Amino acid sequence: MPLTDPSEPPPRSAALRRWLGNFWPAPLGIDRREHLRMACGAALGVLLSALLARWWANVWGIEAPWMVASVGASAVLVFGLPSSPLAQPWPVLAGSTLSALVGALCALLVPDAAWSGALAVGLALALMVQLRCLHPPGGALALFVVLNHGGGVHLAVFP
């Protein structure tokens, strides 16, 4: 004989646990070797980018951030989702470069950072879509350039 009546609703804790369980992500079908490849690839890609950007900044005597966070976001896309259209060479390179240039232009033309930042992200998105080089970290890069007060166009060459 069951201890609970089937016509009674389940206890609140069980209902809450089931509801919260709906937010838990589905398991990934990626084995440990692929996890390791992704993590090592991203780490090595960021390291190589950082070393190259720092060397380039020293060669040209540029005093600016030699790497920004959007490089890490790009590495997640390139090494974590390599078959994604957003992680292909054209979107990564053109989307980032275009966004940095748009950010520098907006910072130059619009003095208020709130307006300039919003305009930079919106214009960068519109241009990336038009040129088929949509890369989400590009939006972050456009905003970073504005918040860095233009940061110079050199950020477009090595973000």
Question: What is each PLM-predicted segment?
Answer:
Residues 95, 120, 141-145:
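Hydrophobic core segments of transmembrane alpha-helices in multi-pass, intramembrane catalytic enzymes
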Residues 81, 123-125, 147:
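Acidic, glycine-rich active-site loops and adjacent beta-strand->loop/helix elements
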